[in-house]
């Protein structure tokens, strides 16, 4: 009898807890509804409010009034590539990065012999600190896979820095390389070759194109090996890579030639017309982009020589002449030299 009463009592407690949870949830939803009703533009009364997280501002989408500034971004500090990663990383902590072999989750002992107050460590404790550093390095890189990642990711970072690539490209390249390691695609290939191929694939995925020649200049492997490894990993990892467009090269080439935005816009316009007439198919994107910039610079009164354009684009003057003649003839562009 006593046991039955205990069961009934526990059931009653569970029901009360569930009712309390439902009540709290309804009250929270009601508060959110009230807040949303209050969130209107004081200038025009619009509810079309836009959160600009880059500037930390709340802006009216209709009249442009800045309603609130310097608000706190309550979003996560990490990145996720799929739903599972997003669910696993629902936490607060140090930022996570794929560009470090341990994803930035371990600690590191500084190389300077100073304490947390900036004071120099006594000679008596320096030997102990040296041993701690040595064991910390061994613990961080404890097996062959981690050693592989540590070397490859440092190589990726070096090449990306030499090419001036943004953080997103580095993260993407690190993800591609990690997938190649997980599928055991490194066996029989050099680490430098796979790292260079991963960086080339990441550049194409992020629409920040770099040519194989540019990757070769900063890597320690040949152009042929990079291309062969790239084709292999893109096939094995089923990477979805769109053909590189000549338009993607225009901003970088124009910047290298110190050309104004008018020339860049004209170059893009020429390339779009060429693409509609399928004049870019089967031709190197850098050569077509260089020819379009050469034509646009003449039309806009900021002429650059074929030699200057060729040096920035990494193509020959002959290529520019051939592509320039094709574009001018097919698009009926009159150029006064």
UniProtKB/Swiss-Prot annotation:
Q: Where are the zinc fingers (TFIIB-type)?
A: 37-68
Asked whether the keyword Transcription regulation is assigned, the reply is: yes
Stated family: Belongs to the TFIIB family.
The sequence repeats are at 154-237, 248-329
Where on this chain does Zn(2+) bind? 41, 44, 60, 63
**Gene expressing this chain:** tfb
Question: InterPro entries of this UniProt entry?
Answer: Cyclin-like_dom, Cyclin-like_sf, TFIIB, TFIIB_arc, TFIIB_CS, TFIIB_cyclin, Znf_TFIIB
Keywords noted in UniProt: Metal-binding, Repeat, Transcription, Transcription regulation, Zinc, Zinc-finger
GO biological process annotation, one example:
transcription preinitiation complex assembly
Q: Which residues cross the membrane?
A: none
Read off the NCBIfam families from this record. Answer: PRK00423.1
Q: Name one GO molecular function term.
A: zinc ion binding
Q: Which GO terms describe its cellular component?
A: transcription preinitiation complex
| Free-text function comment from the UniProt entry | Stabilizes TBP binding to an archaeal box-A promoter. Also responsible for recruiting RNA polymerase II to the pre-initiation complex (DNA-TBP-TFIIB).
Tell me which domain of life the UniProt entry assigns to the organism this sequence originates from: Archaea
Q: Does the keyword Zinc-finger apply?
A: yes
Record-given protein name: Transcription initiation factor IIB
> Pfam families recorded for this chain?
TFIIB (PF00382), Zn_Ribbon_TF (PF08271)
């Amino acid at each position: 009898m006593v046991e039955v009463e205990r069961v009934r009592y526990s059931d009653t407690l569970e029901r009360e807890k569930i009712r309390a949870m439902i009540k709290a949830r309804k009250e929270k939803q009601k508060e959110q509804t009230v807040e949303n009703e209050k969130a209107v533009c004081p200038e025009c009364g619009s509810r079309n409010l836009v959160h600009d997280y880059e500037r930390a501002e709340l802006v009216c989408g209709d009249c442009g009034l800045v309603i609130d500034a310097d608000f706190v971004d309550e979003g996560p500090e990490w990145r996720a590539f799929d739903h599972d990663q997003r669910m696993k990383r629902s936490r607060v902590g140090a930022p996570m990065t794929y560009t470090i072999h341990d994803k930035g989750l371990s600690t590191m002992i500084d190389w300077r012999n100073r304490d947390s107050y900036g004071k120099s460590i006594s000679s008596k404790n320096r030997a102990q600190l040296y041993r701690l550093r040595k064991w910390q390095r061994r613990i961080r890189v404890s097996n062959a896979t981690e050693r592989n990642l540590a070397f490859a990711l440092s190589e990726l970072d070096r090449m990306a820095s030499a090419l001036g690539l943004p953080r997103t490209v580095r993260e993407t390249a690190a993800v591609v390389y990690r997938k190649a390691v997980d599928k055991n695609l490194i066996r029989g290939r050099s680490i430098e070759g796979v790292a260079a191929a991963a960086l080339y694939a990441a550049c194409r995925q992020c629409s920040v194109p770099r040519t194989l020649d540019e990757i070769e200049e900063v890597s320690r492997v040949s152009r042929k090996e990079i291309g062969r490894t790239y084709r292999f990993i893109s096939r094995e990892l089923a990477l979805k890579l769109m053909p590189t467009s000549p338009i993607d090269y225009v901003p970088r080439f124009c910047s290298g030639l110190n050309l104004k935005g008018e020339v860049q816009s004209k170059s893009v316009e020429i390339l779009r017309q060429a693409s509609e007439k399928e004049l870019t198919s089967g031709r190197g994107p850098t050569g077509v982009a260089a020819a379009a910039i050469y034509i646009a610079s003449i039309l806009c009164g900021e002429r650059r020589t074929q030699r200057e354009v060729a040096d920035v684009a990494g193509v020959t003057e002959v290529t520019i002449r051939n592509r320039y003649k094709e574009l001018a003839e097919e698009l009926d562009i009159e150029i006064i030299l």
